[in-house]
Amino acid sequence: MRGEIMKEKCGIFGAYSQDATKKTYYGLMALQHRGQEGAGISVWDGDIRTVKGHGLVSEVFKGGSIRRLNGNPVIGHVRYSTSGSLSEVQPLEVECCGYKVSIAHNGTLTNFLPLRRFYESRGFKFRSSIDTEVIAVSFLNHYSELKDEFEAMSRVFEEVKGAYSVLMLFNGKLIAVRDPVGFRPLSFGAGDGYYFSSEDSALRMFCTNIRDVSPGEVIVVKDGEAESKIVGRSEHAYCVFEYIYFARPDSIINGISVYWARYRMGVELARESPAEGDVVIAVPDSGRTAALGFAHESGIPYMEGLIKNRYIGRTFIMPSGREIKVRLKLSPVKEVIKGRRIVLVDDSIVRGTTMKNIVKMLRDAGAREVHVRIASPPIRYPCYMGIDIPTRHELIAAWKSIEEIKKEIGADSLAYLSVEGLKRAIGTDKLCMACLTGNYPEWAFDFKV
């Protein structure tokens, strides 16, 4: 839920086409949900030029700055983190071994520090503190020896562990890379040019021939042609929270509709943990699709009982109190809630503080009962692959039972979707569910350096 929020690291977009800069700008706008705190675009015009800054895409590229970036190919990035200097906003320009690259990265490296120390011991100088630079240095180091993008990336896959979908501008070429496990999504589209995006929903305005970049695949676009090779292999483990929460509902990731996966989560939840209620409502927007599935399966009518204030922007100065924050963002429809038994559906509970205040809000609006249903299993473990999940002691499910959480949030009943129910809803078991189970994919921690 977006109140106590888990945050995705970023979104990336790339274009090799006419008007590539403008299309990349539009693509980043379509990926704005993946990061609201920073944005940037790099273009190739015989050299690499980059404009980036803190804020939304529309804020960074206001005043005509986008018109000064003419080139092809182009890559762009949206970022969530508020920490770090402007030099750490992506795309990141990196020079070493006599070469220069601009790189945009979605994910997190699990062996960032040992790999950085390894390269520092060999005389490489790092200009930022982010793991993205390590990927670029590894690539340029191996390319300087092998003089082939595919062979260089094969070495990178052996060396760099963790989650990374990457776009790079290199010598007039556009290079797309997805790690061998496929943690983070990456889509590839062809039409009047070639396009890449963290989600296919951002590609549909430009092309209809769209597919996933396969785990371990490298695509090099140069001279108007795209060449592809699978150069890294491992057991696939797609991030489960792309389906639960992060991706847009209209996206298709790894061949699976995000909308229907969430809808089926609600269906499975209703089968596993039915509730006696008069109306099903969702925590907007994160719980809506699952709530529709729950309502359909249970036969309990769905209604809009909470209205989201969409005009509190990123720069709004929020008050310090948690309850007033929730009430500024959400408002109950008393005519829907008063005197009724409410089944409240959301995608997840992280710390529990936001849900506690929503339950109180519903009771204040006259709800007879509040039954909370969560369309994912309890989050008990941190993520090391690019999702900003709080430390384990901040995760309420890591140290409290479901009965204790129910009492903490003030609900009449509480139930979560099971791990098996989640797998059935998504339709695959090729998932990274480490934050739910504590079982981390081996490849991501098999350090070679």
Curated annotation (Swiss-Prot):
A Gene Ontology biological process term: 'de novo' IMP biosynthetic process
Pfam families for the chain: GATase_7 (PF13537), Pribosyltran (PF00156)
First-level EC class: transferase
The protein's annotated pathway: Purine metabolism; IMP biosynthesis via de novo pathway; N(1)-(5-phospho-D-ribosyl)glycinamide from 5-phospho-alpha-D-ribose 1-diphosphate: step 1/2
Positions that bind Mg(2+): 286, 346-347
Molecular-function GO terms, alphabetical: 4 iron, 4 sulfur cluster binding; amidophosphoribosyltransferase activity; magnesium ion binding
Catalytic residues (positions): 10 (nucleophile)
UniProt entry tagged with the keyword Coiled coil: no
Cofactor (UniProt): Mg(2+); [4Fe-4S] cluster
Catalytic activity as recorded in UniProt: 5-phospho-beta-D-ribosylamine + L-glutamate + diphosphate = 5-phospho-alpha-D-ribose 1-diphosphate + L-glutamine + H2O
Segments forming domain Glutamine amidotransferase type-2: 10-224
Gene3D superfamilies from the UniProt entry: 3.40.50.2020, Glutamine Phosphoribosylpyrophosphate, subunit 1, domain 1 (3.60.20.10)
Keywords: 4Fe-4S, Glutamine amidotransferase, Glycosyltransferase, Iron, Iron-sulfur, Magnesium, Metal-binding, Purine biosynthesis, Transferase
EC number from the UniProt entry: 2.4.2.14
UniProt xrefs under CDD domains: GPATase_N, PRTases_typeI
Residues bound to [4Fe-4S] cluster: 239, 383, 432, 435
Family: In the C-terminal section; belongs to the purine/pyrimidine phosphoribosyltransferase family.
Known role: Catalyzes the formation of phosphoribosylamine from phosphoribosylpyrophosphate (PRPP) and glutamine.
PANTHER family per UniProt: AMIDOPHOSPHORIBOSYLTRANSFERASE (PTHR11907)
Name of the protein described by the UniProt record: Amidophosphoribosyltransferase
Lineage: Archaea, Methanobacteriati, Methanobacteriota, Thermococci, Thermococcales
